[in-house]
């Protein structure tokens, strides 16, 4: 998708804020723990290449979702370890090896497919994924884990690490978290040959369960300055959001009593109202359910009226403003502030999703 540089809608990314957030977490965990930056999904909408280049010197490696994301980083000049968290199909192993990309092995069946297809695993670096209770990919049985580690070694692969992922580390109720932690500890202790690198800590675990860190943390949404729990748990120390979203008024008109606005004519003007048009819509990830939410114009909250269209939305203005007046959708303007979590609450979703849905049509400026 082509970024729309010739319209005034843009995302502003503060790379220094991201670096400072990483350092803040590092200051609150033991100094001997490794830090992996999670830059999947285009670094949660912030720009994977730009973010990775900026923080490469202060982290020990990177985590991505799939092989294409990993290759993008390698081609951009990133040299540190890149772990693909998802499953890469056997026929793509040679490509991963050629790019020195570390793969996740989540089942003995995957290894059997490699053997059946005569895939050369020699020199491949892998981490074993353990399903401690998330229910997605990963090994559940200790016997399978031991066989995997043994047979991968015999095949010439290098088993560098083993990891799991917590489902509820961002919740106040620790019951499920403790169950998973116990499962993973028992699994690790039962291995005949445990890999050197053991990691289970995501953003939430690094914030609220730092005492359970093994020897590495995977920093995701916290790196971008967002609370993984939304509003459920207070942050133990400050972090700063790295992304703001802004646009400009491209059209302003006065509508009179009874006039209707937008698809479905869902908004009806009462009295005389100034209505401004902003060039952002659901094709940009600013979804239709944002009707009734507010944005900031001239330091004041202005309601989104009518349905959000594919490319545009309309807002009610307290007075006539000129074309080109700044509109803040996420971020600070004057004394008003709209956070990504505010947007998420309006949509009844999580702040992660808000950022990841911001499409490539919106150019990122650093």
Curated annotation (Swiss-Prot):
Pathway: Amino-acid biosynthesis; D-alanine biosynthesis; D-alanine from L-alanine: step 1/1. The modification N6-(pyridoxal phosphate)lysine is found at residue 40. Its EC number is 5.1.1.1. It catalyses: L-alanine = D-alanine. The active site is at 40 (proton acceptor), 263 (proton acceptor). GO terms for molecular function: alanine racemase activity; pyridoxal phosphate binding. GO terms for biological process: D-alanine biosynthetic process; peptidoglycan biosynthetic process. One of its GO terms (cellular component) is cytosol. Keywords: Isomerase, Pyridoxal phosphate. It comes from the Bacteria. PROSITE patterns: ALANINE_RACEMASE. Its cofactor is pyridoxal 5'-phosphate. Substrate binds at residues 136, 310. Catalyzes the interconversion of L-alanine and D-alanine. May also act on other amino acids. Belongs to the alanine racemase family. This is Alanine racemase. It comes from Streptococcus agalactiae serotype V (strain ATCC BAA-611 / 2603 V/R).
């Amino acid at each position: 998708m082509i970024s729309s540089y010739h319209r005034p809608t843009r995302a502003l990314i503060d790379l220094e804020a991201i670096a400072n957030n990483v350092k803040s977490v590092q200051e609150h965990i033991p100094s001997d723990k490794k830090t992996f930056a999670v830059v999947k999904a285009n670094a949660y909408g912030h720009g994977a290449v730009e973010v990775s280049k900026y923080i490469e010197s202060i982290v020990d490696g990177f985590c991505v979702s799939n092989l294409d994301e990993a290759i993008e980083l390698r081609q951009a000049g990133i040299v540190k370890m890149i772990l693909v968290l998802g499953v890469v199909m056997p026929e793509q192993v040679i490509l991963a090896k050629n790019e020195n990309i570390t793969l996740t092995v989540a089942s003995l069946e995957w290894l059997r497919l490699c053997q059946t297809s005569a895939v050369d695993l020699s020199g491949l670096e892998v981490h074993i994924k353990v399903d401690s209770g998330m229910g997605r990919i990963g090994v559940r049985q200790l016997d399978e884990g031991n066989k995997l580690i043994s047979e991968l070694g015999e095949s010439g692969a290098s088993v560098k690490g083993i990891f799991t992922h917590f489902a509820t580390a961002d919740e106040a109720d620790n019951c499920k978290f403790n169950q998973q932690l116990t499962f993973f500890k028992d699994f690790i202790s039962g291995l005949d040959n445990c890999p050197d690198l053991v990691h289970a800590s995501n953003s939430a675990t690094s914030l609220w369960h730092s005492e359970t860190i093994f020897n590495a943390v995977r920093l995701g949404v916290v790196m971008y300055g967002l609370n993984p729990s939304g509003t459920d748990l207070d942050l133990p120390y400050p972090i700063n959001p790295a992304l703001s979203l802004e646009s400009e008024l491209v059209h302003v008109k006065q509508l009179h009593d009874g006039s209707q606005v937008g698809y479905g004519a869902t908004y009806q003007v009462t009295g005389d109202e100034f209505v401004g048009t902003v060039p952002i819509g659901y094709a940009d990830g600013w979804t239709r359910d944002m009707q009734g939410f507010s944005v900031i114009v001239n330091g004041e909250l202005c309601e989104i009226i009518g349905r959000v269209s594919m490319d545009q939305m309309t807002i009610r203005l307290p007075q006539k403003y000129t074309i080109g007046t700044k509109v803040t959708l996420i971020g600070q303007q004057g004394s008003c502030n709209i956070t990504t979590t505010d947007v998420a609450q309006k949509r009844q979703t999580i702040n992660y999703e808000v950022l990841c849905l911001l499409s490539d049509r919106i150019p990122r400026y650093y």
